[in-house]
Amino acid sequence: MAGEVMSERIRRAEILVEALPYIRRFSGHTLVIKLGGAAMDGGEVDSVLQDIVLLRFVGIRPVLVHGGGPEISAWQERFGITPKFIDGLRVTDAQTMELAKMVLTGKVGPDLVSRIHRLGGTAIGLSGEDGPTLLVRPRAAQGGQELGFVGEVDQVNCEPIHAMLDQGRIPVFASIGLGYDGEAYNVNADTVAAELAVALRASKLILLTDVEGVKDERGDLLTELDKEEATRLISGGVITGGMIPKVTAGLRAVDTVGAAHIIDARVAHALLLELLTESGVGTMLVSSRSGEEPVNAAAGTVAGTA
């Protein structure tokens, strides 16, 4: 029995040693992590938050962006509103906008902040209206259909976010933006995460979801996806629904951010596996294929294994 205990302790020590070069590489770097509402419904939240708190303690600067789609939809239905989406974007009338604010800034955000505090971290909840940190313009009609109070990010004010990070805090960001007309706008959380990653010059953008990653026509997981292939899969109806803004957001970021990934939050400690080990759990997004074996820009490891 004592031998088994010692073997387990050695195994844990080896895991820490394996993580050391990755911790050294990312220490002081900013990461933007988006946790989707569907992933939160699956019960993986504490595992994700434990990972985020650990990253903060080892000198990495995580920014958490959260969704809340399933809960917003549930509240819409309580008020007799049928949720409607166009290319993964929620059609948002005035009443739905109020419900979104209530859910994101009044419930989901504070709950995540409380959980982080219980895990030993320090977090502050905010939305794009605060500061304001996100100035947005109304998003153009999609396929001839108006989206209502749906915003497109025009400016990011990084100063309050940098201040929180410099204080050792974890910003927990709700995807609400402020329009130039003074109105609040619902902004897709994947889009918010990408724009924050670009503005903050993050080393990585990680989009956590409740599926393995992006799949091809055969249903096989794509460990790497470039812009050309993504465009083909979207136009061909292979990438659909809520995966469209995820892929679009990730590809928007990769020209500036070190790397962008869509990973499976259902895998325990998926963030640590992605960042601090050689194991991969999703799809890496790249600008274009180089014709060589894809390499993780920040960690220096083969795509699909980092």
Q: Which ranges hold each PLM region?
A:
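C-terminal catalytic "cap/lid" subdomain
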Residues: A2-A306
